[in-house]
Amino acid sequence: MPKEKFTVITFGAPAIGNDEFAMEYGDKIDLLRVTNTSDPIPGSLQTFFGGYKQFGEHVKYHISPRISSNNHDIAMYLDYSVSEYYKAFDKAVTAGIAKALPYNKTTPGKPLVALWLHGAPGLEKRSYVPDIKRLIAEEYMGMFPSYVVMDDALDADAFYRHEDIIRLSQEVGAEYIVVCGIDGNQAKDKNYWYLILNQGVFKVDGSLVSIVTFAKKVGATGTIQATGENLLNAKEELQKHLPFVSTEQQKLICNY
């Protein structure tokens, strides 16, 4: 298979092969080597003492000292990879190479969903993980053929009463309303926390269709994995009640 059709990605500093391996396959593989600043086995040591030949493109993540003990955790690499993806994607949007997801989309014959998103103050800001609310918003937008994001930053300063949400959703012509809230609190003296996703589904007349809560335990790393698991559960619940929800894993980063 031509190397243009696939990319091989390695995490950490794996022993790819010796000089003979590199000569045989080096120009046949589109290789991306991802390492981090706290990797216990630097590639240079493998090169000098192990006889391994490093090739391909090298990307190094500068990880927070707070998670240096998790430097070989694949969940850590997933957290950082999503963060790096957003940085690269935003640059591409600025350069006009890519287009950001629209905050409203209409597909003929598909019910319009008014989407409301809430990020609780208790959700700690961690500099070494991506914007969880952005990830969740984009995943929800990928679930609905027709949607309009009514507010992606619900908080105490922009409080809407239930009747306000109903009225505003009716004004845009929505048939259904989905309210998604995320929260995360870390108990004192604990090295883990829980990422919580609340999801409420209503008809535009205000009647309740479904309301559920999902929670996943998160350590120093694993935020994206926990978010993805919550999203998969939330999507399964949506599909029980809204048959037009996309059945394809179009956007789920957790689907790896």
Regions found by a protein language model. Give the residues of each.
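Short His-Asn-centered micro-motif
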Residues: I9-A13, C180-G181, Q199
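N-terminal segment of the mature soluble domain
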Residues: L112-V178, L208-I211, H241-E248, C254
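Beta-hairpin (beta-strand-turn-beta-strand) motif
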Residues: G181-N185, F202-V204
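Short, surface-exposed coil-to-beta transition loops
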Residues: Y192-L197
